[in-house]
Every structure is written in structure tokens, then in C-alpha cells.
Design a protein with these regions (language model features):
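Bacterial Sec-dependent N-terminal signal peptides
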Residues: 1-27
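General helical structural elements
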Residues: 9-10, 38, 153
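Immediate post-signal-peptide N-terminus of mature secreted/exported proteins
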Residues: 23-92, 175-179
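C-terminal amphipathic alpha-helix
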Residues: 45-48, 52-55, 59, 66, ...
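A structural signal for well-ordered alpha-helices, especially hydrophobic packing surfaces
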Residues: 63-70, 74-77, 109-112, 116-119, ...
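Short E/K-rich amphipathic alpha-helical oligomerization segments
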Residues: 79-92, 120-142
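Mature extracytoplasmic domains of secretory-pathway proteins
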Residues: 93-125
């Protein structure tokens, strides 16, 4: 009976691990899709409204940083589980250090703060631009506001994923004697 309990427990652990890996790979795929969308974002032309132009420039800079973080995070993830991007086990891969992970976590935290600021700026800019009635300026304004909304939404989702992923990697490294 004792051996049977161990076998059942072990099988649940194996099934749980497989489920977590599958879910993580699915999340990584979604992250990759967001990453590609972020890379395709094009900063709109100047609108001559300083607050809106400043917002679009800041959104662009935040998008560049997010696009720089995503491949680094994916690399850390694959190194932490000892696999290549294709899912092939690789025993020669060097596990990431806790310092590497903490450095990336700091960058991700900074991104979180930037996105919170961008979100508050967006609401201010939206209120400010809603009073403009000049039909010649409206298309540029709408284009810039839509760009900011789309980008902030993508960046928000990606940053939440990045924060959770780095937290899990750090947790795995520090509790699993993987250092």
C-alpha cells in the first residue's frame, strides 16, 4: 500500500509538471506573438500637441525596451529548464545565475512603472485632445491616440507575463538547488 501511494503521488507530480510546462510553452507562444506585434508598432507622425507627442515617444521607448527584454527572458527560461527553444533537452546549457535573473527582474520592474505612468498620461492626453475640433488635426490625433492605446495594451500584457515568468524562474532557481 505504501509503494502504491508513492507511485500515485509520483504520477500526479509528473502529470502536474507536464501540465505546467505545456501551459508555460503556451504562454511563451503568446508572448512571442505579442513580441512580434510590438516590433511592428510604428510611431505616428508629430501632431503638434506636445503632451500627445511626448506620450508617443515614451510609448516607443518602452516598446523598444520590452522588445529587448522578451528574448533575454525566453533565453533564461530555456536555460533554466535545460532545453533548447525547440524543446530538445540540452545538458550542456549553463543554468542562469540568480544575479542575471535579478538584473532582468529590475528591468522588468522599471517597465511596469513606465507602463503605469504611460497609462495615466494617456488618460490626461485623451481628455486634453477631446476638446480639439480642427478637422485637419483630428486624423493625426486619432492615429496617435490609437497607437498609444494599442501599444500600452500590448506592453501591459507582455510586462505582466515577463514579471510572472522572471518570478517563477527566480523561485525555481533559488528553491531547487539549481544555482
Amino acid at each position: 500500500i505504501f509503494i502504491m501511494k508513492k507511485i500515485i503521488t509520483l504520477s500526479f507530480i509528473v502529470l502536474g509538471t507536464m501540465f505546467v510546462n505545456a501551459q508555460t510553452k503556451e504562454e511563451i507562444q503568446k508572448s512571442q506573438e505579442r513580441y512580434e506585434k510590438i516590433l511592428k508598432l510604428e510611431t505616428p507622425k508629430s501632431t503638434s500637441i506636445s503632451s500627445l507627442d511626448e506620450l508617443t515617444v515614451n510609448v516607443g521607448a518602452t516598446a523598444v525596451e520590452s522588445a529587448n527584454i522578451t528574448p533575454l527572458l525566453q533565453n533564461l527560461y530555456y536555460r533554466s529548464i535545460g532545453e533548447t527553444k525547440d524543446g530538445v533537452s540540452d545538458v550542456t546549457v549553463k543554468k542562469p545565475s540568480l544575479d542575471e535573473c535579478k538584473e532582468l527582474a529590475t528591468r522588468i520592474l522599471s517597465q511596469t512603472e513606465k507602463i503605469q505612468n504611460l497609462t495615466s498620461l494617456l488618460s490626461n492626453v485623451t481628455n486634453e485632445t477631446s476638446n480639439i475640433k480642427n478637422p485637419l488635426k483630428l486624423p493625426k490625433i486619432l492615429s496617435s491616440v490609437n497607437y498609444a492605446k494599442t501599444a500600452i495594451s500590448l506592453l501591459g500584457e507582455e510586462t505582466v507575463f515577463q514579471a510572472n515568468a522572471i518570478k517563477n524562474i527566480i523561485s525555481t532557481l533559488s528553491t531547487g538547488n539549481n544555482l
